A protein has these predicted regions:
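Conserved N-terminal phosphate-binding loop of PLP-dependent enzymes in the Aspartate aminotransferase
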Residues: 1-167
């Protein structure tokens, strides 16, 4: 960084007191060695391809649940990202390139009901899935077994939300 900015975290600085900074591990030899090892493992792109494929399967499975249960939500995303969008009033996805509202940021960037979000998270937790907010990501470690487990947990969570009057 620039010297004038880095002075703020120096022990002796012109500002009179040291700015607290937790530091980073990027100069740590163990972290550097781990980073090199990971880069070698992902160099052929296979882990990323596997994560992306798992996410596509998960999005498809979750959307099938929503269609079958007639729930006005939609699941979309790119690569290994999964986004759940409650209160959706547009057409159902026809393929994995789908983005709600033709990617209209003003319609996509809205806050969802906090109580619904909490109930959704709790319903998934009760069914063995730890989901953060309205989105998730897959990794190369997610096999078809985990994807199927998650889709089944999502279906049970949707049923619970409906039974409790959230949807």
């Amino acid at each position: 960084g620039r010297a004038d900015l880095m002075q703020a975290i120096a022990f002796e600085n012109p500002f009179g007191q040291k700015m607290k900074h937790p530091g980073t591990y990027n100069a740590n030899p163990l972290s550097a060695a781990a980073g090199i090892a990971v880069l070698k493992q992902i160099a052929d792109g296979e882990p990323c391809r596997a994560a992306n494929e798992s996410a596509a399967k998960l999005r498809m499975g979750m959307n099938e649940v929503l269609t079958r249960k007639n729930v006005n939500w939609v699941v979309y995303g790119q690569f290994s990202i999964i986004k759940v969008f409650p209160g959706y009033d547009g057409p159902r996805p026809t393929d994995d390139s789908f983005v709600p509202y033709d990617n209209d940021f003003d319609r996509l960037d809205r806050k969802h009901d906090a109580q619904l979000g909490h109930a959704f998270r709790c319903a998934l937790l009760l069914n063995g899935v730890d989901w953060f907010g309205w989105g998730a990501m897959t990794t190369a470690a997610h096999s078809d077994a985990e994807i199927n487990f998650t889709v089944n947990a999502f279906e049970r969570a949707i049923d619970a939300l409906r039974n409790d009057g959230f949807i």
